[in-house]
Amino acid sequence: MLKTLPPTLREKKRYVALEIIFEEELFQKDVIAIVRNALMNYSGVLGCSRTNPWLIDYNHPYGILRISREEVNNLRSSLSLTNEHRKKPINIHIIGISNSVKHVREKFLHVPHEPYYKVIQKLKKKGPKK
């Protein structure tokens, strides 16, 4: 059985709050494709793998993206150069960067913090999806 790494040896992360201005509603898979293509076009495969982008949450037009701490400037520059998606204009605005999801939601997206156990209780009350 594998042991987990201690916190001092884990990769440091940053969380980025994004606002995507596009004339149509985008889904999570579209946002992932936009971010990966932007990184690939700007810094190539190596830069994309070092940045290690991961979409945490997305509700049109706002999203939270997890990236590597050392590659914040790489992500900023690659997203600022992105101006087209499906031959339509797109603008990606970085609202802010923090080291925790909670701070990104509260400070930049103005979403109040809700403890995780309350979210699970709400999902149990709704029942299974049909």
From Swiss-Prot:
A GO cellular component annotation in the UniProt record: ribonuclease P complex
GO annotation (BP), single: tRNA 5'-leader removal
Enzyme Commission number: 3.1.26.5
Signal peptide boundaries: none
Keyword Cytoplasm: yes
Reaction(s) the record says it catalyses: Endonucleolytic cleavage of RNA, removing 5'-extranucleotides from tRNA precursor
Localization annotation: Cytoplasm
Function per UniProt: Part of ribonuclease P, a protein complex that generates mature tRNA molecules by cleaving their 5'-ends.
HAMAP family hit by this protein: RNase_P_2
Protein name: Ribonuclease P protein component 2
Organism: Methanococcus maripaludis (strain C5 / ATCC BAA-1333)
Taxonomic lineage from the root: Archaea, Methanobacteriati, Methanobacteriota, Methanomada group, Methanococci
